[in-house]
Amino acid sequence: MSRALDAECTAQKDPRNQKRYKVSSCDRISTQEGQYIYKAQLIVDEGEDPHFTDGVSFIFLTKEAPYSCEVVEFDYANAILFFSSTKLIFVTSDCRVISDATMNTIALKKLLEELSEYNINKSYPLYKFLEGSTDKLKDIKHPPYPSYLEKYFVKDKSQFSAFKASLDKDITFIWGPPGTGKSYTLAAIIMALHSMPGERTAVCCLSNVAVDQLLSKVVKNITVEEPEMKRGEFYRAGRTQDELLLRTDFLFPDDAISSKIRLMIKLYNKKLEGYRTANQQFSNEAIEIKAHLKDAREELKEHTDYLINKVRVVFSTISNFVINPRLKDGLFDNLIVDEASMLAMPQLIALARNVSKRIILVGDFQQLSPITVAGIPVLKNNVFKLCGIDINHTNHPALRPLLNQRRSHPKLVEIINKPFYGGHLMTDNPKYNSIVARPPYSECVVGMCSVTEGMVRFTKGGTRQNFANSEAVMHLLDLYNENEEDTFSIGVITPYTGQVSLLKALFSKREYSTDFQDRVKIGTVHTFQGSESDVIIFDMVDCSKFEKGKPYFGKIYANEQGEQLLNVAISRARHKLIVVCDPEYLKTSPGGSISDRSISIFNTLLKAQWTKI
């Protein structure tokens, strides 16, 4: 595994895989308490879709030296990056901003190398993953869980089966197809494990957003079932931006310092909301407040991190777990990992090496697999597959499938049910939603927006764009924006970063209200895994005409990866799916690498109502 991680690190350092942006200008806008705030104008090549998340580290490279910096804010429409540095930067010509993806890989490799110095305890559940014996389950004795949890599963036996197995066995795989209540079931499992005397549980997710979403469900349960929950039982490691969680007293110690920091965060957020309402969120004053807010969140994290070794349940991202000494060296009885279909074996070893009783892995192996640049099997195969679990092998004794789909309209479930889940999903969402009745595509759950005059062009970075498709998407958004009474969410999904960049550029030029902007999310399929929207607009991009050369489907649609992509894109929709594509191109499916399963999905979509625009 060490060699595989070395190869991954080398691939990540390759300039072709790094995110590097030239800087046309950089100005210092503020100096506060030994911290400098800068405003950099980036040169973003056509088709690039830069991502800069608040608080994330990056390298600002000048001719003189590299500087470690942190993101304060990013103005996507104008490609302006606001950032902080503890050092005064001597700006030179030919500066660059570099996103360094190797930090987590290096930390993971170092941790695994430390592990090689001693043997993992053979009584720990992780050992079974290493020797390939996860089918040999061990019974875990435990006291009764709170009786109120029984009512959570009155209507769903598959959820109760997963709940019981998670408590009774040392290893549990919970297979949760879209909309079957993974988070709902997990929240109950977490409550039950918390009730076990003396046991400590680590809960890990891929992203901060996912951590906050799951913790919010647990907090909601606690508010109803155990309103007198004392402090020091649950802790959210890392930095949260969720205001509800920041207001939840039992997640924080009862001391003057943390109370003061939380109050400051609340005040900063209130001020920033005022700037945003006035459309001045990128003013120098707002950026200074945002920098203070970032520092306050970091201060709160550092002040409260000691709780990791004291609380019963810790929530964290996977990357934070690997890097944070208190987490990676901590002793836990139980480990829960959400979205485990994107978890490879090296990450599991890092998370589970000190877990003594239970490993509970939750995810859908029919969705996206681990992200890797090097493409080495041990890094790209998820833990389900490495344990012999896939759609053709679902009889593993530790596997507990969730079968009742309650999120999406039955007609949407029909599209993915047979191809991806063998027809085992049962729909339990008969409620008619008014979104279906409204235009565009009134009374249609699935609509096909036919774009026959499109043309695929390749950007400098090799990604794809289709301007006609993007205009069709914007026309659909314009229609939804016209109805001011609507409050539902809209997701725009596309496989290519080049098309995301184009769509975001067009979206930023529209004079949509702040409320409508907040309700629309535009991104690649990967950015949507684990999320959902009332309406999904799926822009397929590929069509029968290329700017140069013979048309062919992009490799992202190929083979198993293409199947997973289609499954995720379609299953994000709760009530309505609109596919923007060239229907004739779907019928021919050129390229030779499109699987029969993907073609069957195309044929199902082609049966939907469509109109030319």
Residue ranges and their predicted role:
Residues 196, 319-613:
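Conserved helicase motor core of SF1/SF2 NTP-dependent helicases
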Residues 23-161, 231, 242-274, 578, ...:
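Pre-ATPase regulatory/linker segments immediately N-terminal to the P-loop/RecA-like helicase/translocase core
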Residues 1-63, 467, 471, 477, ...:
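Accessory interdomain/linker segments of ATP-dependent helicases and helicase-like nucleic-acid enzymes
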Residues 71, 127, 131-252, 295-298, ...:
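ASCE P-loop NTPase helicase motor core
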Residues 36-38, 54-56, 65-67, 77-79, ...:
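Core residues of folded domains in eukaryotic genome-function proteins
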Residues 59-63, 317, 539:
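Residue-level recognition of conserved beta-strand edge/terminus positions
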Residues 59, 70, 82, 173, ...:
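Beta-strand cores of modular interaction/reader domains in eukaryotic scaffold and signaling proteins
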Residues 271-313:
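Conserved P-loop NTPase mechanochemical-coupling segment
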